[in-house]
Amino acid sequence: IAEAEDAVKIQFWKAEFIAVNYDVTWCIEECRRYGTLNSYMVFLYAAYHDKKISTEELYQYLDEIDKLKLCESNGQFQYYLKMLLQPLQDAYINDPSKCIRIATIEIEFCFCLEWNNMKCFKIEINRNPKFLSDLIAIVFRKDHMESVEQDDSEKNRISNLYRLYHKIGFCPTEKGGVIKEDDLEAWIQQFRKFLKENDQSSLFGMVVGRLFAFSPVGDDGHRPCEAVRNMIEKYADKSMQSEYAVTIFNRRGVHSPTAGSAEKKIAQGFQDNADYLALNGYPKTAEIYYSLARTYNSESTREREEAENGRF
């Protein structure tokens, strides 16, 4: 195959095989040059799995993947991508420059990764909120700019990044279930500054409200944690409160009908949480949970009536 014409090499190297029986460096370079991203990932996985390349070499080879063409995002490609990212994330998550590069790869292929597979992207958002503000600048319109025409490629890119935005599921500066208030406020102030620079200040409440909905529980056993409560009381507007509530509501996902009994129980839990927050000096945060209680009480009534009318 080394002496074959380019057309033959292209056909050979686009095949997704995993045997690594020859000079590994030569094979990888040939696959990168003539193959597809799909075949390249399969070959890299085989080489790494067979311990024929090191983690550092794997990093160098993956640094080239944006030069290759993806045939299609199938389940096999997603599997090999996750398996190759994992050792790199483990090895370089504390190496700032390499972590950033791995994060950009995670972003590039966000359409086939779940949030928990995007470890470096999460770390980089925690380190620097500009990572998130740059994403916001792409997927949302500026406050004082008319919409512009986009070609299909750009529309597809924005669509993928919009889905990435909705995959993000963490509260800023959280480490091991703990959030330090000073760290959180510093992050918030930086993020707000970057939004202002991007002419997107109006999005502050919506974006931060969504992130706050992923807060860990507080030391007192109530949600959100104390640091997030204090930030809500200090910075919240209606958009922040609304987006927090909507995010909590949407996280329930698909569920089986119970004629309203499950919704009634959920509503009571939110009501109890809200009452506690209100009694302890968190009125804005309490209102979020009161609104959730009202929503679930309405859902409970609707489902009970549908059950009584034989719609289940």
Predicted feature descriptions by range:
Residues 14, 207-211, 266, 273, ...:
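Structural register within alpha-helical repeat arrays
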Residues 235, 239, 277-278, 296-297, ...:
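Alpha-helical junction/boundary sensor with strong preference for TPR arrays
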Residues 284-310:
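Short, charge-rich amphipathic alpha-helical segments embedded
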